[in-house]
Amino acid sequence: MLILTRRVGETLMIGDEITVTVLGVKGNQVRIGVNAPKDVAVHREEIYQRIQSEKGSEEPESGNR
C-alpha cells in the first residue's frame, strides 16, 4: 500500500485520467473528490462490497428450455 500525505486542496494522480483531491478535513473525517472517466466505477468500499455480494447471490438461469 502506498501511503501519501496531502493537504486540503492538494491532488494525487492515478494513471493519466483519475485525480483524487482532498477537499476538507473535519475531526476524523476527510472529504475527497474523485475525478474519473465515466467508464471507471468509483464507490465507497461498503457500497462496492454490497454490489459484489448482490452479484454473487444472483443465480444464473437454469438451462431448461
Swiss-Prot record:
**Role summary:** A key translational regulator that binds mRNA to regulate translation initiation and/or mRNA stability. Mediates global changes in gene expression, shifting from rapid growth to stress survival by linking envelope stress, the stringent response and the catabolite repression systems. Usually binds in the 5'-UTR; binding at or near the Shine-Dalgarno sequence prevents ribosome-binding, repressing translation, binding elsewhere in the 5'-UTR can activate translation and/or stabilize the mRNA. Its function is antagonized by small RNA(s).
The record's subunit annotation is:
Homodimer; the beta-strands of each monomer intercalate to form a hydrophobic core, while the alpha-helices form wings that extend away from the core.
HAMAP family of this UniProt entry?
CsrA
Native species of this protein?
Marinobacter nauticus (strain ATCC 700491 / DSM 11845 / VT8)
* One Gene Ontology cellular component annotation held by this UniProt entry: cytosol
Record GO biological process: mRNA catabolic process; negative regulation of translational initiation; positive regulation of translational initiation; regulation of carbohydrate metabolic process
Q: Which domain of life is it from?
A: Bacteria
Q: Which InterPro entries match?
A: CsrA, CsrA_sf
Family per UniProt? Belongs to the CsrA/RsmA family.
Q: Which NCBIfam families match?
A: csrA, PRK01712.1
Whichever gene encodes this chain, its name is csrA
Query: Which keywords does the record carry?
Result: Activator, Cytoplasm, Repressor, RNA-binding, Translation regulation
Q: What is this protein called?
A: Translational regulator CsrA
- Give the subcellular location: Cytoplasm
Presence of keyword Nucleotide-binding = no
Major place of residence? cytoplasm
Entry annotated with the keyword Cytoplasm: yes
**GO molecular function terms here?**
mRNA 5'-UTR binding
A Pfam family annotated for this UniProt entry = CsrA
